[in-house]
Amino acid sequence: MSRLAWTDPAPLEVERPRLPWWVMLPRKLLLVASPVIAVLVVAMVLVFTARRVRRYPLFLIGTATLAALGVGHSWWAPVTLLTALGVVGGLWAWQYPDSFARTVVRQIRSEWRRAQVYAWRWRRVMLFTELTKRTGQGLHRVHYPHICRVCADGWRDRVSVKLLHGQCADTYATHADKLANSFGARSCRVRVDRPRRIWLDLVHTDPLVEPLAAPYLAEPGTGVDLARVCIGHTEIGRPWMLRLLDRHILVAGVSDAGKSSVMWAVLRALAPWIRCGLVQVFGIDPKGGMELGRAQRLFQKLVCSNGIEAVELLEHVATLTRQRAEVLRKLGTRKWSPASGQPFVLLIVDELADIIAYQPDNALRKRANVALQSILSQGRAPGVCVIGQIQDPRKQIIDFRHLFPIKIAMRLDEPEQVDMVLGEGVRKRGATAHEISEDTPGVAWVKLDGRRDPDRVRAFHSTDADLDELSAYVAAGHNQAPTLLLPTGKGAA
């Protein structure tokens, strides 16, 4: 281009300054309205101060108290107060470490994380991830989601966010990876709190990385709550309570994902009742008994194949289910209870697909499907629970996943399999079962029917020594079960 050629300068892009509307009022009107304006200004200052104190109560109240003591008395007053607080805090942390960490350490960490991470980056991150809304031109027309609360638990930060109009939880779930990277977290999960309010769980470390040792066996005769069977821990440190009463459980995962850890943890928790006959366990292990045969004495009957014996056992339990339902109906009882005089029946099927999908005999495969679906659809009220384990959760393999109210997804191969097991859209809400490490067998995501959000859990790990102890514990009992209703036929329908 010639040096003499003329180029138009870039247009000057400036924003016209916008003054408050009340500045434009006549001077006399301003003089008359000055008391009202003063009250409004004071109210705004008070609201601003109250919001800051609510966000950083420990820091602001503590700083104000120390400053007031220093000004009103002398330098030794705040020093004395700090020394006394340090001594009291040390004794508190020594005697009650969990309470101190939950009350003091969490509050300090939360205020620090909010000030150091989220207060500085929030608007920029919202702008760059396109989670803002515009109502016109200029910076003053940009609306940002509002941070309501920050709770730092150490391994994760929980950020409560007030949504803008026109936004929903899925809007943030779509940008979860961007939010995690922006705030320096490993992952971000989105949970719905209430209308226009969500929680962002920004995870920094994995609290379930260490295996969980199997608990001690309960004393013989100890009661068992079938509605709350402890089989591990959740991600937030609480016991993982699995409901067996009125439920069926589907466990899906690849090889070596730790599917059997769920089964053995359940049997270990039920050991006192298995020992005395209040719980009867039936098992099918198509792998020749390589897994369930390790503690064969726990089972009322164990079939180690996928042939005719396995199908007959399914039909046996299906007939038992119908007969028990008939007895309960005549007694005027809608649900099974230990007072009915009948044991709780637990059916465990390892490698479920070998029986309902991979069985080469079409007649046996059809009979197995009919019997199993009959148990799943009718067995909840009569006190029959099914735990099915499967590697391939595709619909072509098992098309009645909806009959399992509790679904557990352990490590899976593909992202699409997560939604197959747990339900549509669960992966967007953070249930990344396909990202579970191979070094953490027993870690899983569990989804209950009727609940929107899944939970991340880890089951107890049972060693060979634990299984030997469990088998000996059950065998040492009298195992005198109440009289079973004997099936009169083999059909399941």
Label the model's feature ranges.
Residues A119, T132-L139, G154, L164-L278, ...:
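Phosphate-binding P-loop/Walker A region and its immediate neighborhood
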Residues T135-R158, F344:
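Short edge beta-strands and adjacent turn/loop segments
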Residues A152-L163, D354-Y358:
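Short, hydrophobic beta-strand segments
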Residues F100-H143:
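N-proximal, solvent-exposed amphipathic alpha-helical segments enriched in charged/polar residues
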Residues T333-A339:
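Conserved alpha-helical scaffold flanking the Walker A/P-loop in AAA+ ATPase domains
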Residues R3-R109, A218-K330, Q342-D419, V426-G430, ...:
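P-loop NTPase catalytic phosphate-binding loop
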Residues A433-L467:
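Conserved AAA+ ATPase small/helical "lid" subdomain
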